[in-house]
Curated annotation (Swiss-Prot):
Its main location: cytoplasm. This is Glucose-6-phosphate isomerase. It holds the Pfam family PGI. The active site is at E350, H381, K503. PANTHER family: GLUCOSE-6-PHOSPHATE ISOMERASE.
Amino acid sequence: MTLKSLPAWTALQSHFEQIRHARLRDWFAPENDRAPTRAERFTIPGGGLAADFSKNRIDDETLRLLVQLARDAGVEARRDAMFAGEIVNPTEGRAALHTALRATDPQAPFHAQVSAERAKMATFARAVRSGTWTGYTGKRIRHVINIGIGGSDLGPKMVVHALHHVATPEISTHFVSNVDGADLARVLEQVDPEETLAIIVSKTFTTLETMTNARSLRDWFVARGCPEDALAKHFVGVSANPAEVVKFGIAADNVFEMWDWVGGRYSLWSAVGLSIMIAIGPEQFDELLAGANDMDRHFREAPLERNLPVLLGLIGIWYRNFFGSQSYLVAPYSEALHYLPSYLQQLEMESNGKSARLDGTFVDYPTSAVTWGEPGTNGQHAFFQMLHQGPTIVPIDFIAVLTPEHPLAGHHPKLLANCFAQSEALMLGRTLEEARKVAGPGKEALAPHLTFPGNRPTTTLLVDALTPRTLGALIALYEHKVLVQATVWDINPFDQWGVELGKILGKVVEGDLSAESVDPAKHDSSTTALIERARAALKR
């Protein structure tokens, strides 16, 4: 059966018409919000986190029908198939076993292989952190440069930044992803080659951006005095293609393995996270894995009605497919989580930005929403105006860390107050009558500008303290949310064919930029004109 023919879908359509104009402020009114309160009913713990879903435009019947939709769509079966190592990425004929990277059960798929590679990572990380692994002049490593793009960059960068407070102060970690040379050049201004270790991360070890930066970095080392036969002290590779790593010039002993059954955007738990392990240490890296495993167990064991990834995913579907929301916002009220929205952009949109169903037919309903965000309180002074008073409804995930990871007094209560106040203001709004009172006598014309529609839906995720364990759980929560939504939408969240066409055409255009002339028949007139302008500029 297709999604729209499922009984729960039909029931949700009828239910939506019944409650689409219901007001959250009415549901929270004292005469309606009796014990157990709405907040008590809709706040759910799991995996060391808690989620307050009460400020969403849902009632008990909404959740009942959404959970039935998950059952009808086969969420439980697909979840179990993924954990069992079955082929859940049919377009590439692969399993999706990122969960095996943090599993503690010896019977988990590839457990021995995963454990051996993690032990190799730990040995290397300890050597770098302790100073026993040195550069070619005998100086200890003080800078690590991670070169990768997409999942080989966004996840590690996000985690290293988030866990800065538990990282060693002896080593600075830098991330280079963009093929724009300015990205690498800016980092090279900050480092000494004698004290720098490069980690080159690419599943194929042929990725254009990564290999361009890797070659430039290798040339930089040599130009600044590092003998070519000493580069092994400064370069390691992470790849599913070891032969290509060795061909590049990295010693075979310096190659760490990743596997084709782990997608790039799910890979920070593997050797792709080597930069994380060097920064925070093997023991803390194990805690990161343990937190993800906590959420894995919750996802597998909790009933769907009390299952955080399931509910987060289903509520997202409620807004995307019934309310017609085009985007959703992630607002972590934590500067440590600065890069979480960027990480989730790839996780959500590269996974679920698809139009083809698993059977090859095309969907007739929206799939992935546009994912965006910025840490609070910065976002309040940029785009919250639109969230409060614009005509577009944007569902929001607020993320609040209850305990600060810094010693500065007076900051954290203000941060939390802003987070909670924003969710309340978005829910309550301000009526025209209330606005008239705020405007005051004689300022009737101002009142419409002081109104807030309210009824804007938000979820608040609560993290007691930002530790490797709670961060691991938070990341895994969103990973599993993506699977839930993909299953309901009947799409494959583990491939990314949408990035291929641009790559293919990019190689053609790159050749044309250095050619004597460009055949106008090769491209449309716009692209041809752009190439000609660029060719002229490159010759200056």
